[in-house]
Structures are given as C-alpha cells and as structure tokens.
C-alpha cells in the first residue's frame, strides 16, 4: 500500500463536521479512535490543525477539547495561530446586501452573523420558526439591516431545496447547504487559510495533508497536497482524493493515518 515517507513531518489539517466529529449537527461526538489517532500523530511529531467552515467561536470548543493550537476557520477566512485569533476576513458587504434584499423581496426568512460569536441575528422570529435550528442560537434584533454593519461573516437563508437556485444574488457569493432547512452564505476557500498558516511557519506546502468529507472541503483538495476523503464523503471529494478511508464513525481518521504510515516516527 502507498505510504507517506516515514520521517517527514507533515502538516495535517482536519475538517470538523463529518470528519473529526460524527453524529451530525444534533448529536455530535468525537470518536475515541480519532482522539487516539491525534495523540499518536503528535507523538510522531506532526503539526496538527483544524480546517473548518465553522466560525472561529463555534469551533473553539473542539479546538480546546482536542488539543489544537492552530486552526483555519470561517471557511478559510479565519486564522488562529498558537491559540490566538489572527483575523477573520468578512464577506463582501455589498454582495450580502444584495442577497438580503432579494430575500426580503421574496419573503424568505434570513439571519446574519455580524461578529465572532455563537449567536446569529435575525430581524424577527421567522428564521427560527422555519428552521427549528439547534446548530446555533438565533436572537431577534428588530430593524436588523446588513447595511448597518461594517463586517458580516455569514448569512443564513431559510428555504428548502431547490429554492436557492431561484435566487439570482447567490451567483455572486459562496454558499452551501448542510441542513435541509437553510443554506449558509459563507466563505469556501479553506486552501487560502491553510496557505497562510504554512507561510507563517515557513513550511513547504508539499507537506500538507488534508482530511474532509463535504463540498466545502473541495477547495483544500488541491494538487500537490495529500488528500484523504472520509468514507462518508461526497462522491466529488472521493474522486479527488489520494486515499479514501472508512466512515467517520467507523474509525476513519485512525484507519487512514495508520494506512498512510503517519504514526511512524
């Protein structure tokens, strides 16, 4: 079986949901085998980091629980190094305004994330009423208007598929659907954040290893990096992968690291 060169230090980036974490958004848990794998990777001398679409605030719990000090968050637009948030690049404000204006015109519920927190804001209760969402807390801010904020990090549009394809304004923004009740308007360029971290540490990008499962991981499945798709990954990601492991809840992280020789020091 093909293996990575044993003595070479690798820079390994893990997606969270569906990769490190199983159970979906409602019953998330980290498989014990994944925790063991992370410890063995550290013992082997590798650099470990998270690469998630979650906001930095929404990912901090897993970062601390699993002992990470470095993280790409916010779909590639947020960077945390040595435990300190460096920055988060917001979405293009005018693009977000156009999306929200179209939602208003079509009477589609919406919400915004205007700071790095675990709470999003909505102009009324319709977003929460529509979604019954437990992923993050939604607070009602009467008169909420994206034009009043300097920075907007994410927007959320409550709709069932295929409504999103009727929204012309979505053609100019990155977005994805991870839940049936709503879509996320959020950055989708994890490779951008990974390169920033590699530049900071002066490391060769050829030493990058990435683990992912979903459409927002496609941006980090690039040529020249070692790409591992979970068994539960979407087909498009598997087609780009160098190695396909077992499902997240079937020891996928551990099995891949063992198969690729990453535990060897």
How would you name each of these model-derived features?
Residues 10-26, 221:
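Asp-based phosphoryl-transfer active-site loop
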Residues 11, 70, 203, 209, ...:
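Hydrophobic "anchor" residues on beta-strands that sit immediately upstream
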Residues 68-76, 89, 132, 175-177, ...:
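Short hydrophobic/aromatic-enriched beta-strand-loop microsegments
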Residues 223, 227-228, 232-265:
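Asp-based, Mg2+/Mn2+-dependent phosphohydrolase catalytic module
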Residues 102, 108, 113-223, 232:
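Conserved acidic, metal-coordinating active-site core of Asp-based
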Residues 29-126:
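Active-site phosphate-binding/coordination module
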